[in-house]
């Protein structure tokens, strides 16, 4: 199998001052192209360290994606490191210099002399175009390894990988068929509980079951070679059966997007009233394009379940909304949820059995509970569901 690695560069990445989203994106993107990364490294803005690791990985990797260090400043050292590792100099790429000058001229700006550095490439480098920025990429062959050097700006990096680097890899190597990856996301059951229930399943050859916990959800993944797809799809039915009512969606689209689509398909508008969740519901649903009407975030206050239910019923009527969803304030370890619908208003009072989790996590969990309440009603299910450390202690229904 082709050995593909990634090298992230930059002091800010090494020291944790920024999150390396490029590495996460590349690992996921290449995995679905049948090119799983075998190693990832990070090095700071130090020429000797860069040269050392380029020479080291050139003896082990078939392909190395180097990210960052192609800018115009003194700490952008990737081109010089590549040239030094190869024992050659930098040469000016005249065509790219003219392209950069045009780029600045069209925007009514004068190109700084320091930008000239971005057109200086190792003598043996293959130029790689950057259609959305001033940092061109390049490729060099060092020992057994084909190295691609890419800009750190995420939008530029992704375009270059998708439209320049992947086609070159397909031309030069015989790439394997992408793996099959079946995913579902659960809410309300712990990772250990799910694993205990699923560990008895017999997996086909080369197939693995993976778990990813990201509070408040657990993602289950069944991954394997394309040759085992039929067996995997049969096994997937058992996985879904075991996960049961805790499954909130399949695939990677996300619950807000699926709810948004269902609301649009059924021509339901939605109004929100949030206290404890502080606008998380509105943020998540608006990003997914949900048909929202008036959304409010109000100060937390103690309410009975009946008060919350009557308030959201009135709010739905006042805003002529199809649906209305409320999350009350968090008082004395208790919280209310209420959903007003054409069929009536359904309300739940819950109790937190632990307070060891941070405020942010508790807000995320409650936002997910509210979304799941809405999902379950849209699917014709009982709206009540529990989380491991949240107990439903009271329910109420108001007739239309």
Curated annotation (Swiss-Prot):
InterPro entries: CinA, CinA-like_C, Competence-induced_CinA, MoaB/Mog-like_dom_sf, MoaB/Mog_dom
CDD domains cross-referenced by the UniProt entry: cinA (cd00885)
Classification via SUPFAM superfamilies: CinA-like, Molybdenum cofactor biosynthesis proteins
Pfam families cross-referenced by the UniProt entry: MoCF_biosynth (PF00994)
Transmembrane segments: none
NCBIfam families linked: cinA_nterm, molyb_syn, PRK03673.1
Family note: Belongs to the CinA family.
Name of this chain's protein: CinA-like protein
Organism whose genome encodes this protein: Escherichia coli (strain 55989 / EAEC)
């Amino acid at each position: 199998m082709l050995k593909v690695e990634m090298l992230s560069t930059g002091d800010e990445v090494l020291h944790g001052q920024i999150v390396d989203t490029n590495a996460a994106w590349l690992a996921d993107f290449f995995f679905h192209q049948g090119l799983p990364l075998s190693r990832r490294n990070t090095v700071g803005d130090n020429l000797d360290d860069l040269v050392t690791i380029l020479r080291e990985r050139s003896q082990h990797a078939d392909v190395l994606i180097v990210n960052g260090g192609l800018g115009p400043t003194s700490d952008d050292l990737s081109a010089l490191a590549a040239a030094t590792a190869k024992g050659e100099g930098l040469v000016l790429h005249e065509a790219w210099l003219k392209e950069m000058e045009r780029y600045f001229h069209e925007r009514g700006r004068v190109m700084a002399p320091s930008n000239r550095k971005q057109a200086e490439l190792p003598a043996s480098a293959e130029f790689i175009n950057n259609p959305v920025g001033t940092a061109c990429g390049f490729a060099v062959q060092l020992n057994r390894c084909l190295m691609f050097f890419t800009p750190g700006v995420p939008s530029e990096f992704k375009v270059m990988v998708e439209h320049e680097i992947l086609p070159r890899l397909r031309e030069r190597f015989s790439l394997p068929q992408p793996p099959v990856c079946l995913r579902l996301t659960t809410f309300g059951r712990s990772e250990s509980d799910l694993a205990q229930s699923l560990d008895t399943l017999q997996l086909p050859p080369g197939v693995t079951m993976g778990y990813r916990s990201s509070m408040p959800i657990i993602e289950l993944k069944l991954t394997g070679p394309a040759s085992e797809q039929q067996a995997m799809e049969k096994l997937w039915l058992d996985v879904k059966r075991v996960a049961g009512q805790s499954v909130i969606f399949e695939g990677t689209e996300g619950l807000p997007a699926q709810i948004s689509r269902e609301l649009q398909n059924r021509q339901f508008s939605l109004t929100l009233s949030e206290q404890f969740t502080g606008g998380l519901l509105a943020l998540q649903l608006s990003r997914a394009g949900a048909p929202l009407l008036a959304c409010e975030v109000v100060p937390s206050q103690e309410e009975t379940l009946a008060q919350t239910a009557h308030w959201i019923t009135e709010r739905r009527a006042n805003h002529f909304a199809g649906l209305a969803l409320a999350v009350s304030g968090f008082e004395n370890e208790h919280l209310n949820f209420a959903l007003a619908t054409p069929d009536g208003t359904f309300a739940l009072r819950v109790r937190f059995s632990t307070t060891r989790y941070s405020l942010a996590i508790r807000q995320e969990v409650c936002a997910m509970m509210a979304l799941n309440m809405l999902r379950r009603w849209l699917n014709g299910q009982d709206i009540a569901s529990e989380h491991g450390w949240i107990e439903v202690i009271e329910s109420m229904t108001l007739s239309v």
